[in-house]
């Protein structure tokens, strides 16, 4: 992987990630395909929304179908028939999200398999091996996503262990002869001094890109913005910056304003299945009765398959009848909305008009522009 940086506007960056499997224009949003599928979508449909890279989940694909089944097909690309690049998380987030069935030790994490209850163990070395078999174009180090709230002492211990795991991840990645990209993950909760130590330690180890982890886990938005404003300038300018698990459309906008290049989140797909749809002027809850006889498109400014062909009334009908097609059409729209948002941000950065774009984005939704505390 090669990262090319074209231009900046304030702290926002316009560039691209170059892979053997294709080019990803940045800032980029990556749809989440946890089990080897972006829920309800074929790879061709995902690509048609404008997505150039997707995300897979190491932990869940390890449990089912498992490494051996994956290797029978070649790798995850061959298994799911996605031709573009794939980023896989390391399983570290499951350390956070499956907290009631796990035990963290220096060596790794002991889990109860959420499928059948069997005891299992995952460590940095195993995570690197699984991601190697998946053929991931971007491999993430194995870390602990520090929960929120966490006091300073716990956050320090967690961050320091994640640094040690980062070195073990790097060593195993290299010993496998993996020629793809490996990203480090910056931890330290909401504490700037701990984030400083984490960035410095990861840069000393050396990675192809750097993710900001441990945000969007319940902390106030002001803390997320503050940490991004503090951390991003410390990340080497020639490396991509990835904000993990984020987020709402406004979170993408605020991340880009502060120098983030990559995002992922289940929100557009999960919300679509629940009838919560993103449009230029905010949000449409298609389940509401007021849409029952509305013959207008979901978003008159959207060029997606759903908006070009179907009315709000039809989408409301499908949702009320619990039809699978409704979830699919909603997902197509939400994914396209996110990709259109990213394309708009990229164009605004190219033209040096990012703050004008941001102002219009919030004005259309009747909301104030959040303050930006950067030099």
From Swiss-Prot:
Cofactor annotation comment: Binds 1 zinc ion per subunit.
Span list, region RNA binding: 245-251, 269-273
Top-level taxon of origin: Bacteria
Assembly: Homodimer. Within each dimer, one monomer is responsible for RNA recognition and catalysis, while the other monomer binds to the replacement base PreQ1.
The protein's Enzyme Commission number: 2.4.2.29
Active site per database record: 89, 264
Residues the record lists as binding substrate: 89-93, 143, 187, 214
Keyword Zinc in annotation: yes
Enzyme class of the recorded protein, top EC level: transferase
Biological role stated in the UniProt entry: Catalyzes the base-exchange of a guanine (G) residue with the queuine precursor 7-aminomethyl-7-deazaguanine (PreQ1) at position 34 (anticodon wobble position) in tRNAs with GU(N) anticodons (tRNA-Asp, -Asn, -His and -Tyr). Catalysis occurs through a double-displacement mechanism. The nucleophile active site attacks the C1' of nucleotide 34 to detach the guanine base from the RNA, forming a covalent enzyme-RNA intermediate. The proton acceptor active site deprotonates the incoming PreQ1, allowing a nucleophilic attack on the C1' of the ribose to form the product.
GO biological process per UniProt: queuosine biosynthetic process; tRNA wobble guanine modification; tRNA-guanine transglycosylation
Catalytic activity: 7-aminomethyl-7-carbaguanine + guanosine(34) in tRNA = 7-aminomethyl-7-carbaguanosine(34) in tRNA + guanine
Classification via Pfam families: TGT (PF01702)
Pathway: tRNA modification; tRNA-queuosine biosynthesis
SUPFAM superfamilies assigned: tRNA-guanine transglycosylase (SSF51713)
One Gene Ontology molecular-function label: metal ion binding
Family, similarity comment: Belongs to the queuine tRNA-ribosyltransferase family.
Name of the protein in question: Queuine tRNA-ribosyltransferase
Cellular-component GO terms for this entry: cytosol
UniProt KW keywords: Glycosyltransferase, Metal-binding, Queuosine biosynthesis, Transferase, tRNA processing, Zinc
Named cofactor requirement(s): Zn(2+)
HAMAP family according to UniProt: Q_tRNA_Tgt
